[in-house]
């Protein structure tokens, strides 16, 4: 599940809500930031 955050209104938007437009559906701002996944990845040190 891909989520984006609007830099103007700070609301979290799912990919299904966007459609083909890369704009916030709430405030029509064009700049969205892709959020990092909530899963923590552990890497073994060598």
Swiss-Prot record:
Its EC number is 2.7.7.6. GO terms for molecular function: DNA binding; DNA-directed RNA polymerase activity; zinc ion binding. Keywords: Cytoplasm, DNA-directed RNA polymerase, Metal-binding, Nucleotidyltransferase, Transcription, Transferase, Zinc. It is found in: Cytoplasm. Zn(2+) binds at residues 9, 24, 27. SUPFAM superfamilies: RNA polymerase subunits (SSF63393). Disulfide bonds: none annotated. It catalyses: RNA(n) + a ribonucleoside 5'-triphosphate = RNA(n+1) + diphosphate. SMART domains: RPOLCX. Its cofactor is Zn(2+). Binds 1 zinc ion. GO terms for biological process: DNA-templated transcription. InterPro entries: RNAP_P/RPABC4, RPABC4/Spt4, Rpo12. One of its GO terms (cellular component) is DNA-directed RNA polymerase complex. It comes from the Archaea. Part of the RNA polymerase complex. Interacts with Rpo3. Forms an Rpo3-Rpo10-Rpo11-Rpo12 complex upon coexpression. Belongs to the archaeal Rpo12/eukaryotic RPC10 RNA polymerase subunit family. DNA-dependent RNA polymerase (RNAP) catalyzes the transcription of DNA into RNA using the four ribonucleoside triphosphates as substrates. This is DNA-directed RNA polymerase subunit Rpo12. The gene is rpo12.
């Amino acid at each position: 599940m891909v989520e984006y955050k609007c830099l103007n209104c700070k609301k979290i938007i799912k990919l299904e809500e966007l459609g083909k437009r890369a704009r916030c559906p709430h405030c029509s701002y064009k700049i969205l930031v892709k959020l990092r996944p909530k899963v923590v990845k552990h890497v073994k040190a060598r």
